[in-house]
Amino acid sequence: MEEPAAKRPKLSDRSEPLTQRDVVLFQKEALFRQLNRYRAEARAGQVQVEELRRAHGQVGERLAAVCGVVRSVARAVADARGDGDARALCERVAGGDDDEVVARAAEFAAVVAGGLGRGAAAGEGWHRLEAVNSRLAAENAQLAAELGAVRGFYAELLRRYDRDESETVRRVFKVEESEPPRAATPVEESSAKGAASDGEAATAVVEREMQIEELQTEIRVLEDTVAQLTDWKRLNEQELTKLRQMASSAELSQRHPTPPSSSNLSADLQVLRSKVEKLSHENKELAQLNEAYLGKFQQLSADREIFNNRLSAEFQTAQETLKKHNSNLEKDLVRIRTARDELLSKVAVLEAQKSKSDMLEDLEKMLALQQEQLKALSEHKPEPARDAVMKELQDLEKAFKELSQYSNKKYSEYVNQESLMSKLTVEKTKADQKYFAAMRSKDSILIENKNLSKNLSKSNELIQQLKDIEKSLQAKIENLNKQLHISRINEKRLLDSNKTTSLKIMDLTSQLSKANKSSTLVQQECNKLIEEKAKMESKLNDLEIETKNLATKLTYQENKSKKLHKTLVSNGGDNGALAEELENFRTVVYCSLCSKNWKDTVIKTCGHVFCADCCKERLAARMRKCPTCNKGFSSNDLLVVHL
């Protein structure tokens, strides 16, 4: 169901300032102009894409055919050539796809040229054709650039024409127009009728002039085309004559090839035989060297095993001897320490006993002296004062006894203290002896530890030396293994070269016929490529002619548009039909509620189309009726469409 046609919006008066409605209408017309421009570009792009697809298909077919011929030539050349690199390249070209063939075209051409060794005249003609091709390609690029510039100028001219014819542009930018017509009086009406008839006559004259100019333009285009075709025909005849001469010279060279002389073949055979003999002699020498290296390797392996066994046995013997010597030294040290402690204790006891005996001897001497004095006193004769003396003596005796008891008591205490001191001294002496013995044992242990550390360091040095010797022997063994591997590789290489040489000798006799076949195929391929080049040049010439015709038509259309514009301005013609069509298009495309968004949402209950924003606004405001037919709808009745 189509929307009812909305009324055409009116612009505000020019004397008044711009309104929001004028700006919106200006933006809408700008969008329509841009849309028309994009449509024109899209149509031109579609035409170009179709033409390019057709040309691409033709080029793909021709490329496939050319690649097939090149693969066949590569197979023939691979059968003819005996060297490894060229044969491998030909096999890759023959077995690869089109991309592989194109990527290795230059290398394959060099191989074919080296195998043929002739065709200098054809090569010169090919280079000349390549120069002509490059020149035509440059001219084609230049013409394509000119055509693009002309198209851009024509598009810009159309855009300016659309903008100049737009009322909104004139309203926004305040372009001055001619004075509007006043109310017509009867006299003015009659004069207007006469002017209208005169305008129709002038329009007819302008149309006849435009037709005449169009015919003259077509005549000039046809004359230019005929001249270009004549020049192209003359150039093609010259190129055809040159190609026929080149083909005849190539056929003569193929029919009468210069066969290789027998002397050259015999010389090549002699050289190959000498190479084979030299390689066999080198192979024998390498075999002898290989055997000598194997013997040296086995001898070194046996020597290394013997040396390792002997060294390990000596190391074990020295280690056991050192352990036994250390155990004997420890036993002797314990025995010496025990004897020393016993002797020290005996010496201390003897020293204590000696001091006690000396003291007893002194006391005995004192007692003996006192007894002698007592005896001497008792032996004296009595005197007159005997009683007093006796009494005094008794007192002295009593005092002496008390003194003796006291001295004995003190002596006993002293003896006890002396014995205690002697015991403590003995204990202290024993403790000192034990301390000094411990210190001496510590020193001896430190000395033994130092000796053991020295022995251990010497053992580690010996082990490191043995490891270094083992590494050097391992390196020598690896070098011998590498030399053995190299000698085996050389032997294998010599055998392969021997086989390759024999194969080359067998292939030398068949290369001449295969080379002739490959040259024939290459000549056919060259002829096909020349035909393809001629077709491409003819197509390029057609494009040049078409470009010139388009340029001429463009000039004619520009002149025609200018004249039509002048006629329209002078006659004051109305473009109401075009404006009405544009307004109808706007009504169909834009939403009838806001007149600014595209129609993209349809109401399924009635089929009317609006923009999504207006539909959501009406649902949010609880206005759930169609603005056109007042049918109710909900959010589930909305459907997104693409116009």
Curated annotation (Swiss-Prot):
Pathway membership of this protein?
Protein modification; protein ubiquitination
Location within or outside the cell: Nucleus
Q: Which CDD domains match?
A: RING-HC_Bre1-like
The record, for PROSITE patterns, names: ZF_RING_2
**E.C. numbers:** 2.3.2.27
Name used for this protein in its record: E3 ubiquitin-protein ligase BRE1
Provide the coiled-coil residue spans.
Answer: 200-233, 262-406, 446-494, 520-555
What family name appears in the similarity comment? Belongs to the BRE1 family.
Residue spans annotated as Zn fingers (RING-type) read 591-630
The superkingdom of the source organism is: Eukaryota
The protein's predominant localisation is: nucleus
Kindly list the cysteine pairs connected by disulfide bridges. Answer: none
One MF term in the entry's GO annotations: ubiquitin protein ligase activity
Instruction: Tell me which InterPro entries the record gives.
Output: E3_ubiquit_lig_Bre1, Znf_RING, Znf_RING/FYVE/PHD
Q: Name one GO cellular component term.
A: nucleus
Task: Give, as one word, the top-level EC class.
Answer: transferase
Name the reaction it catalyses: S-ubiquitinyl-[E2 ubiquitin-conjugating enzyme]-L-cysteine + [acceptor protein]-L-lysine = [E2 ubiquitin-conjugating enzyme]-L-cysteine + N(6)-ubiquitinyl-[acceptor protein]-L-lysine
Main function:
E3 ubiquitin-protein ligase that mediates monoubiquitination of histone H2B to form H2BK123ub1. H2BK123ub1 gives a specific tag for epigenetic transcriptional activation and is also a prerequisite for H3K4me and H3K79me formation.
Segments of this protein annotated with the region Disordered: 173-200, 246-267
One biological process GO term for this chain?
mitotic intra-S DNA damage checkpoint signaling
Which UniProt keywords are present, listed alphabetically?
A: Chromatin regulator, Coiled coil, Metal-binding, Nucleus, Transferase, Ubl conjugation pathway, Zinc, Zinc-finger
